Amino acid sequence: MPSTYINILLAFTMALLGLLLYRSHMMSSLLCLEGLMLALFILSTLMALNTHHTLSAVLPIVLMVFAACEAALGLALLVMVSNTYGLDYVQNLNLLQC
């Protein structure tokens, strides 16, 4: 396995570990999710370039669209929670349940 793939998998693992460890604040969780999506995007792009299939080139674009939607929804939720409660703790999301 080339060192490029090892570095990308290490970045994915570190972002996943950060998501598991720093889940108390919403902003840090969103940053770790963006790191996960970026590592997946780079890995899927490299895989699409190495396989030389036309259909596999669509996957990174779809993944980037979902990452942009996730970032927009996450930031909207962060703004709403911080304006309502004044904090960005994830525990405040339990208060939003009906």
Curated annotation (Swiss-Prot):
Pfam family, one: Oxidored_q2
Entry keyword Transport: yes
Top EC category: translocase
UniProt catalytic activity: a ubiquinone + NADH + 5 H(+)(in) = a ubiquinol + NAD(+) + 4 H(+)(out)
Transmembrane region(s): 1-21, 29-49, 61-81
MF (Gene Ontology): NADH dehydrogenase (ubiquinone) activity
Entry's Gene Ontology cellular component terms: mitochondrial inner membrane; respiratory chain complex I
Membrane-protein topology: Multi-pass membrane protein
GO terms, biological process: ATP synthesis coupled electron transport
InterPro entries, per the entry: NADH_UbQ_OxRdtase_chain4L/K, NUOK/Mnh_C1-like
Metal-binding found in the keyword field: no
UniProt keyword annotations, A-Z: Electron transport, Membrane, Mitochondrion, Mitochondrion inner membrane, NAD, Respiratory chain, Translocase, Transmembrane, Transmembrane helix, Transport, Ubiquinone
Main location: mitochondrion
Domain of life: Eukaryota
E.C. code: 7.1.1.2
Disulphide-bonded residues: none
Record localization: Mitochondrion inner membrane
Family recorded in the similarity comment: Belongs to the complex I subunit 4L family.
Protein purpose: Core subunit of the mitochondrial membrane respiratory chain NADH dehydrogenase (Complex I) which catalyzes electron transfer from NADH through the respiratory chain, using ubiquinone as an electron acceptor. Part of the enzyme membrane arm which is embedded in the lipid bilayer and involved in proton translocation.
Self-association state and partner proteins as the record states: Core subunit of respiratory chain NADH dehydrogenase (Complex I) which is composed of 45 different subunits.
Protein name listed in UniProt: NADH-ubiquinone oxidoreductase chain 4L
Organism the protein comes from: Choloepus didactylus (Southern two-toed sloth)
